[in-house]
Amino acid sequence: MIKQYKLLNNIFGWIAFVVAAFTYLNTVEPTASFWDCPEFITCAAKGEVGHPPGNTFFNLTGRFFVNFAGGDLAQAGLWVNRMSALFSAGAILFLFWTITALTKKVVCRNNKSANDMTWSQAITILLSGMVGALVYTWSDTFWFSAVEAEVYAFSSFMTALVFWLILKWESRSAGVEGDRYIILLAYIIGLSIGVHLLNLLCIPAIVLVYYFKKKPNAELKGTLGALILSVFIIAFILYGMIPGFIKLAGQIELFAVNGLGCPFNTGTVFYFFFVLALLAFGVWKSYKKDTSDRTLRILLAAGVVLCGMPFEIGRAHV
């Protein structure tokens, strides 16, 4: 039964995606709408940098969709709006799979094995996912942002993807496969910073899922400790890693040019290769037998988040 359920789960998820995409693409804004949307459309079409703190990865992705306008800039707004529609439909897809993953834990909690799932349980899980996904599809707030060139549609997609990835890790945490999900999750978080900082709010949920998986008999004290740790992680990324990564590059550039008399961009190039060297060192360290698994995971997570950080360099030029 479990094989049939996995197939149906994938099929129903893509049905939810098609329904959402059809809804949004047929109700999408034909041109620019209010607030920041005209600015984002212009930045995507012209390769410009938007208002602080900047949304560089959003603009790069928008520029890709503007290419489908075929050089007709009058259609640029429509294509960036369509980008939001498709990413919103993608958010619905991962929302469906998230709901079914969580519902399955409740419905099948008394089953001795995964193969003990019954048809009634499978139908309950799939219908729960479809109802939840479609209710969110046609909710006023989400539908409103799904049809215009705002960062919230893209950010919602990133948020849904990140939370789904931690649930996939939770179900497959043993071995190398589980580590791959953690690495991909860290990279998506790094990229999402170039869209909107909303994605960082997933970190407390991610930390709790990780903690409960590692500590099945978790207590209140440990749960509160995990939440406090997640707050420190958010603060470190928000106030340390994001501004510090760019600020350090600027300080090295100023020292190289003003202090050492080097040509322009010397410090920036040095900093770039220095970061690459650190990442290479982390990879080399992973092959050392005396390195603990916990240290490796921390190095990999921090390094992969930094891989997404170059998209934030555009913020420094605002």
Residue ranges and their predicted role:
Residues 14, 82-117, 161-165:
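Transmembrane-helix motifs of polytopic, lipid-linked glycan transferases
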Residues 28-40, 50-62:
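Extracytoplasmic catalytic/substrate-binding loops of multi-pass membrane glycan-assembly enzymes
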Residues 119, 123, 162-182, 208-218, ...:
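Membrane-interface transmembrane helices that cradle and orient dolichyl/undecaprenyl
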Residues 127-130, 165, 172-190, 219-232:
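Short hydrophobic alpha-helices at membrane interfaces in multi-pass membrane enzymes
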